[in-house]
């Protein structure tokens, strides 16, 4: 087998391979034997058909199968011997085959790039420094109280903390518009669920009043026909309800986790907040490191690898929105191309960090990560046991831990500065992605 490799555009390569005629002929004879074992020819018993008839009937198909198999086998032998870092499937182009002669063909394919990391010392990372305060815990307890709140009807004017039941009709240029009308609509004030100015226009009014509110739809509003439009809403305020918060009693505390006292509840809340904070800070640092890696190493990636990643993103998008699997092919590849390219780049760069630093996954850290995940559930032992029985889930955690270890290696060489943040700031940024 002789090998000649050409470098084409970008990461494309072409290899010309030759298969010895004797090897083809030997494989051809074996293929005919397989046909002879199973061939059904009138006048002959199974397995007793003469070779000449087998060759006459099946010779062309057998030779085509042999040539196809030899192209596959010979190419992948070359991949191994030449240590080709193959990306995607090859395209085979056979040359004209002459019976009794050597068979040559070309295989066109892509390779993964040889990555040499650079500029790690130029990566800038801001490391958040956050302390969970008593006020943060108080605020979280207030959230829990609001979740258990009851409502009492009130004759007083509506405030920003009340709940109101309203009828409304929206008008633009004096005409009603689609989606701008509702009856007995329950609105929890102060949550910003309506467009700016809507809730503010209700504050100060009492049950039974009818009034108008003038508002303007935001320029970034989701409905194209309403963006930036001035509107008037005719409001009927049917009911105003005040929020009644429960007292911090043992009965209230027992509704949340295993705590029996307010002090135990506060400790449990702080533990959960610390876990959420750790995850948020880790994700924030990892994101900065990855952004820096890509900026400093804007590597070329194989088109085939991008195409494979696009298919993954398509399937994930369909699953996320509850669609049928066959809908994935209908989603335009352009929607996912940029994300797919970045994911391939990130994967290659992190793999290079792992390989060049000979990083091995820390199994103790894997188990600790699983324990941390389990601690968020009421029965952590059951969650840990579930991971122990599910190799795929455990492998996912291993991959996460391995990436974290790679990020930490890069972090050692990056420019790291610390900046103080509040708990709410970090969690708000985490929610925004």
UniProtKB/Swiss-Prot annotation:
EC code: 5.2.1.8
GO molecular function, one term: peptidyl-prolyl cis-trans isomerase activity
Residue span(s) of domain PPIase FKBP-type: 161-246
Chief location: cytoplasm
Catalytic activity field: [protein]-peptidylproline (omega=180) = [protein]-peptidylproline (omega=0)
Alphabetically ordered keywords of this record: Cell cycle, Cell division, Chaperone, Cytoplasm, Isomerase, Rotamase
Cell cycle as UniProt keyword: yes
GO cellular component: cytoplasm
Biological processes, Gene Ontology terms: 'de novo' cotranslational protein folding; cell division; chaperone-mediated protein folding; protein transport; protein unfolding
Short name of one Pfam family: FKBP_C
Record's subcellular location: Cytoplasm
NCBIfam families: tig
Membership in a protein family: Belongs to the FKBP-type PPIase family. Tig subfamily.
Entry comment, domain topic: Consists of 3 domains; the N-terminus binds the ribosome, the middle domain has PPIase activity, while the C-terminus has intrinsic chaperone activity on its own.
Biological function: Involved in protein export. Acts as a chaperone by maintaining the newly synthesized protein in an open conformation. Functions as a peptidyl-prolyl cis-trans isomerase.
Protein's recorded name: Trigger factor
Naturally occurring in which organism (per UniProt): Haemophilus ducreyi (strain 35000HP / ATCC 700724)
Lineage of the organism: Bacteria, Pseudomonadati, Pseudomonadota, Gammaproteobacteria, Pasteurellales
């Amino acid at each position: 087998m002789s090998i000649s490799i050409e470098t084409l555009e970008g990461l494309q390569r072409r290899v010309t391979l030759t298969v010895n005629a004797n090897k083809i002929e030997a494989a051809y004879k074996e293929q005919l034997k397989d046909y002879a074992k199973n061939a059904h020819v009138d006048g002959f018993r199974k397995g007793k058909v003469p070779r000449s008839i087998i060759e006459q009937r099946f010779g062309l198909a057998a030779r085509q199968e042999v040539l196809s198999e030899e192209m596959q086998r010979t190419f992948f032998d070359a991949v191994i011997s030449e240590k080709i870092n193959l990306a995607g499937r090859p395209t085979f182009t056979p040359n004209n085959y002459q019976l009794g002669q050597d068979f040559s063909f070309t295989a066109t394919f892509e390779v993964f790039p040889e990555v040499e990391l650079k500029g790690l010392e130029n990566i800038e990372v801001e490391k958040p420094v956050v302390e969970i305060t008593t006020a943060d815990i108080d605020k979280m307890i207030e959230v829990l109280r609001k979740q258990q709140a009851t409502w009492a009807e009130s004759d007083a004017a509506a405030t920003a903390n009340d709940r109101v039941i309203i009828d409304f009709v929206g008008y633009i240029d004096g005409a009603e518009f689609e989606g701008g009308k509702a009856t007995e609509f329950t609105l929890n004030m102060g949550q910003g669920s309506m467009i700016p100015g809507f809730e503010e226009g209700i504050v100060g009014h009492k049950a039974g009043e009818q009034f108008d509110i003038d508002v303007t739809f935001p320029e970034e509003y989701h409905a194209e026909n309403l963006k930036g439009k001035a509107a008037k809403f005719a409001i009927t305020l049917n009911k105003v309800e005040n929020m009644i918060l429960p007292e911090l009693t043992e009965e209230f505390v027992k509704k949340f986790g295993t705590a029996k006292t307010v002090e135990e509840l506060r400790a449990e809340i702080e533990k959960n907040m610390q876990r959420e904070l750790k995850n948020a800070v880790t994700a924030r640092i990892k994101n900065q490191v990855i952004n820096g890696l890509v900026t400093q190493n804007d590597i070329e990636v194989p088109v085939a690898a991008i195409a494979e990643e696009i298919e993954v993103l398509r399937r994930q998008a369909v699953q996320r929105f509850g669609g049928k699997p066959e809908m994935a092919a209908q989603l335009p590849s352009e929607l996912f191309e940029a994300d797919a390219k970045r994911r391939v780049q990130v994967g290659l760069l992190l793999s290079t960090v792992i390989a060049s630093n000979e990083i091995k996954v820390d199994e103790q850290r894997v188990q600790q990560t699983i324990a941390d995940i389990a601690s968020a559930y009421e029965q952590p032992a059951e969650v840990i046991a579930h991971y122990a029985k599910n190799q795929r889930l455990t492998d996912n955690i291993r991959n996460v831990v391995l990436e974290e270890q790679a990020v930490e290696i890069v972090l050692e060489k990056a420019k790291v500065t610390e900046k103080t943040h509040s708990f709410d700031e970090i969690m708000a940024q985490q929610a925004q992605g």
